[in-house]
Amino acid sequence: MKLKKTCIAITVAVGVISLSGCSTASALSGLLSDSPDVTAQVGAENTKQLAGVTAKADDKREVKVSDSNIGKIDSSVKKSVEVSTIQANTVNAESITVTKSGSWYDPVVCWILVFIVLLLFYFLIRKHEKKEA
């Protein structure tokens, strides 16, 4: 009887946790900023720009620019930039993608884990009831 009450309490607790949300990103949302990641495809590699530090090798390429009022161009392919906002008048790139952190598989994994825990408790209760009978 004591095991059954414990299993019911754990099942209710798991249900409350699963209904309140169990995203892996939500646990750190208070510590991290809510700004989206910005990815700009300019060359052969995507460069993520967000608030944080990443370590990448800096590979330089020679670029010749004509008819431009830009004095100096940093043409590195694997450049890591730390920014919190991006402001530009004109951006010329092959593609620019702005994404917000979070994915569809976090809730799916959470629900699968809840289902497995509920199945384990069900079989544990059945095994305990068979021993008592």
Swiss-Prot record:
| Species in which this protein is naturally found | Escherichia phage T1
Q: Which domain of life is it from?
A: Viruses
Cytoplasmic compartment residues = 126-133
Record key words, sorted: Cytolysis, Host cell inner membrane, Host cell lysis by virus, Host cell membrane, Host cell outer membrane, Host membrane, Lipoprotein, Membrane, Palmitate, Signal, Transmembrane, Transmembrane helix, Viral release from host cell
Q: Which first-to-last residue range defines the signal peptide?
A: 1-21
User: Which residues does the entry place in the Periplasmic compartment?
Assistant: 22-104
Q: Which GO terms describe its biological process?
A: killing of cells of another organism
Descriptive protein name: U-spanin
Q: Membrane-spanning residues where?
A: 105-125
Effect on the protein upon substituting residue 22 to S: Complete loss of lysis
Q: Where is the lipid attached (N-palmitoyl cysteine)?
A: 22
Q: Which GO terms describe its cellular component?
A: host cell plasma membrane; membrane
| Lipidated residue numbers (S-diacylglycerol cysteine) | 22
